[in-house]
Amino acid sequence: MPLVDPVTMSTTLIKSGPAQQQPAPKAAVPAIPLVNSPLALPASIAHSVLLAGLFYWRFDALVADPVTSLQTGLPVVAAIQAVYLMLSLPPAGSSLSSKKPRPGEKKSSDGREAKSFPTAVISLLLALILTPALHILLVLFGAPFLTHVPHTFLCCAHIALLAIYPVFYVRGSDPVPLQAVVGVSAPFDQTFGGFLGTVVGAWLGSVPIPLDWDREWQKWPVTIVVGAYLGYIVGSQLLGTVFYGRRWEVTPEMKEE
């Protein structure tokens, strides 16, 4: 009976055994393109122009009476956002494909038209539900706690319409893409660009408040709202078009040996 080398035998058994399963990589969160519609791009541009025009027109009223101006402007901004989302972006759960049908091929329907309106309504409600949480967050970052409560709450409602409403519309309640958006690891598109622009703009808008310029527009929360709107318009259009599909580059930390 021939001798069997135990080392060779163990090596053979390891090679012939089932391959060790590697952990599956996390699915990449895709960028959200505009829908394949002739109205998508014009509606996207028009919505930014309308927001900028509305804000410019109401700026003096915002400075004179922030609460009334923010309150009356809230339903108008919500309507502009809702129409833009339904015309330009796919609702959560619909196909992300922007492929045009070939000549003679019948365009397939993914139910986008049927999902757009209910998704827009539900996403709006979710965004407004998070307004108290944004209020608490702003207070933690230095907003007035016992005074200017309606000012802060209405400011947070506008931020929710700009930053959170579009994200819920295209991402839904799936925690994976939502974590990517909050963690700044999602690819740039109009919704993530608007989210990032609103947050950065509102943060930069807080810079002039403590300065001793004694200007009327420095009062709370005028500069915060100005920064949020400017950041949203620039972020959604610039990051959503010029840098579409790219990701925020984060330098990995050096691992300890």
Curated annotation (Swiss-Prot):
Pathway: Glycolipid biosynthesis; glycosylphosphatidylinositol-anchor biosynthesis
The organism of origin for this protein: Gibberella zeae (strain ATCC MYA-4620 / CBS 123657 / FGSC 9075 / NRRL 31084 / PH-1) (Wheat head blight fungus)
Lineage, top ranks: Eukaryota, Fungi, Dikarya, Ascomycota, Pezizomycotina
GO terms of biological process kind: GPI anchor biosynthetic process
Membrane topology note: Multi-pass membrane protein
Superkingdom: Eukaryota
Coiled coil residues, start to end: none
Protein name: Glycosylphosphatidylinositol anchor biosynthesis protein 11
Gene of this entry: GPI11
Gene Ontology CC entries for this record: endoplasmic reticulum membrane
Disulphide bond pairs: none
Keywords: Endoplasmic reticulum, GPI-anchor biosynthesis, Membrane, Transmembrane, Transmembrane helix
